[in-house]
Amino acid sequence: MLASTVTGALQEQGRAKVNLTLRVVGRRADGYHDLESVVAFADCADQLTLAPSPELTLTTTGPLADACGDTSDNLVLKAARLLAEAVPGLTLGAFTLEKVLPVAAGIGGGSADAAAALRLLARLNGLSLDDPRLQAVALKTGADVPVCVPSRACTMTGVGENLQPLALPVLPCVMINPRVPVATKDVFQALGLKPGDLLVGVSDVLAAPAWPKAGASIGDWVAALDQVKNDLEPPALKVQPIIGTVLDALRASNGVLLARMSGSGATCFAIYGGDADAKIAGAAIAAAHPEWWVHAGTLS
């Protein structure tokens, strides 16, 4: 939660969401996919500001503003409009989004921005983030928005509505996006599940992993995470093969403990045993691939 230099303005971060694991249980009769995921949030973020204004507007700035395209259907505005429908008399305003996270990247940038908008409107209007109306609007805005509202490490199940907090240690990491957008719908289409299909067996559903408790080490978490993959990685590789090149670069880096894709791609991440290893690996990969978006930091 941040203040802004603009008089009367409020500011929030839209932190990148990273799926440490992602299991597709199956596809429901309504076409949505049931998922199980361990989610963490990175220390890189978009910045969203809300300033007093009689009209609801959105202006984009920052190095990746052009990637946002037409803002009329941006999730920030969608979330604000839906909350205004749900909460009579809601005070809105002028949003300014400083866009630094890649779009269509598997790190929930648009969802994080929408969640930041909901937090800003909640602050402006004295709403609790636990308000059922806000929670319903978050899910209606997008499947990843509910988890981005608190932006805390958790397990996420269902279509994104069931969240359970996790005591995740701070994980040194490198995140890479090859600056190639990947549409989520294309990856699920490549996965090829029809409504009613299951990707996992009943025994797999019953044998849900027990995640480490508070105080567990990075090594304990890496060992647990290594038991569950990202089911969208194989179909995403078919849609955009450069993901394989990114994963190879991460897996070849010194000190890497675990590397995989986040969400539906194309962003991939690696976990390291210490901050120094992550920074050295990130710098080396950025030097070898200046065309890629590379961030060395932490997940928590």
UniProtKB/Swiss-Prot annotation:
The active site is at residues 17, 144. Gene3D superfamilies: 3.30.230.10, GHMP kinase, C-terminal domain (3.30.70.890). Keywords: ATP-binding, Isoprene biosynthesis, Kinase, Nucleotide-binding, Transferase. It catalyses: 4-CDP-2-C-methyl-D-erythritol + ATP = 4-CDP-2-C-methyl-D-erythritol 2-phosphate + ADP + H(+). One of its GO terms (molecular function) is 4-(cytidine 5'-diphospho)-2-C-methyl-D-erythritol kinase activity. Pathway: Isoprenoid biosynthesis; isopentenyl diphosphate biosynthesis via DXP pathway; isopentenyl diphosphate from 1-deoxy-D-xylulose 5-phosphate: step 3/6. It comes from the Bacteria. ATP binds at residues 102-112. One of its GO terms (biological process) is isopentenyl diphosphate biosynthetic process, methylerythritol 4-phosphate pathway. Its EC number is 2.7.1.148. Catalyzes the phosphorylation of the position 2 hydroxy group of 4-diphosphocytidyl-2C-methyl-D-erythritol. Belongs to the GHMP kinase family. IspE subfamily. PANTHER family: 4-DIPHOSPHOCYTIDYL-2-C-METHYL-D-ERYTHRITOL KINASE, CHLOROPLASTIC. NCBIfam families: ispE (TIGR00154), PRK14608.1 (NF011202). This is 4-diphosphocytidyl-2-C-methyl-D-erythritol kinase. It comes from Bradyrhizobium sp. (strain ORS 278). The lineage of its organism: Bacteria, Pseudomonadati, Pseudomonadota, Alphaproteobacteria, Hyphomicrobiales.
